[in-house]
Amino acid sequence: MSKTSPRLSSLIAELKSVARDSGADVWHDVADRLEKPRSTHAEVNLSRIERYASEDETVIVPGKVLGSGALRKSVTVAAVDFSSSAATKIEHADGEAVHLEQAVEQNPDGTDVRVIR
């Protein structure tokens, strides 16, 4: 199925390319999830990230991060998109909210990441 969003199409192509070059299955898995219809993309609240992530960990969300709940841990969250309240709360917890494109550039091997959906 073709995507109408040029950003999402290029992100999927980049994820597949990096996965092929580095052998990182995590990026291939994220690309496969993003290729599916948007209604199946993850919508993850901060409370879920708080529950399952460890301190100073990188969390990958193949979808959107929403601002419901509190985040007290300093984590790096990489996602396709963030609600404004989620990005604010992540930064107040001394964390970092980055887009998936940046996460792929920083960690092409996909090591030490946790996918939450």
Curated annotation (Swiss-Prot):
Coiled coil: none annotated. Belongs to the eukaryotic ribosomal protein eL18 family. Keywords: Ribonucleoprotein, Ribosomal protein. InterPro entries: Ribosomal_eL18 (IPR000039), Ribosomal_eL18/eL18-A/B/_CS (IPR021132), Ribosomal_eL18_arc (IPR022947), Ribosomal_uL15/eL18 (IPR021131), Ribosomal_uL15/eL18_sf (IPR036227). SUPFAM superfamilies: Ribosomal proteins L15p and L18e (SSF52080). It comes from the Archaea. One of its GO terms (cellular component) is cytosolic large ribosomal subunit. One of its GO terms (biological process) is translation. NCBIfam families: PRK04005.1. This is Large ribosomal subunit protein eL18. One of its GO terms (molecular function) is structural constituent of ribosome.
